[in-house]
């Protein structure tokens, strides 16, 4: 298959919907020779910040000299972003070849039972694990797709698990309370395997503590056993002190990145107990070198243009606070949100820095329409317009902006991906 044909086949699997459970992915991987058993791993779940934590952890491990893998989702601009080895995205050719191999196994599975048809995410996960095995990855950092307990990635046996802060999300699949969602995310905790968490809310943390105790998994908490201090946040980066280490400046903006750095640090200091050595200099160098686009990403000055993928009210509040601190308290918001998110809560959170907004609908069949998003924004803002696409909204905003204006694109990875693709002159795919 050529690249476009491969993407067409993969995206066609989305018609299978979301099927939580490990049976199909386990069978698919078995037919492929169990590639996930050929590398060691770190597993990261949570709601806000798990992608950043994964990127930081991978950068730390690579700085120590390990051959690394990084599996995250979804992507911003190009599908190949999801699967990386030692900082390099899978090539289109490698993706096509592995997809062709996996497709053969999928077709064989379907001959046995139509119920065995793997989903888009299960197939993508299998491709990632096969690529890691072929590339000789020593330690892969794997981000959960949804939840944790029944997520396709939960077939790995990690050296450490991590759980970021938890919010209400995917309630139709994970449950309608923080306790239920925490139980699903804590499903990645393995017997005797260290777990670190940034969660400190009574409901969710209580569930994590209970499951960790039941599985005799040593638990370390950011802000308790894992100490950190946010030293400074500027447009040049975020300076943080982790434990007894010297201060380090991350090239990522936002106070919230200090907590993510603390969680990555917690992972790094737990790994030696599993025989995976990580030096202090690797921690510092990895954090200095980390790159993670779309997270309070400053893409232009005069006018100021910032992209952020925040998609929960908690995330939006954190971003709004950082935007106010770094750029002032008046911004034009371009917002596009998926329909399984708390649109009203997100709109309300961003209203603290904006009374002007352009509502859009990202190119996803799960997105709120521009009209629905605009209706939510009008509850909190007075100047709200709607645009037919993210690209048109951004081009219009930039064309009419003065040098002192601030433009924020937010609400979803899909929204930011389309904005980034337009900004860089590419097509999101």
Where are these regions (language model features)?
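N-terminal leader/targeting and accessory segments in enzymes
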Residues: 1-48, 52-67, 76-78, 194-197, ...
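ATP-dependent carboxylate-amine ligase catalytic core
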Residues: 22, 26-30, 34-37, 63-156, ...
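Nucleotide phosphate-binding/pyrophosphate-handling subdomain across enzymes
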Residues: 38, 134, 139-144, 151-162, ...
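Beta-strand->loop->alpha-helix junctions that form or flank phosphate-binding loops
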Residues: 71-74, 198-199, 211-233, 251-255, ...
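C-terminal helical cap/extension that packs against the catalytic core
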Residues: 201-220, 235-236, 304-307, 313, ...
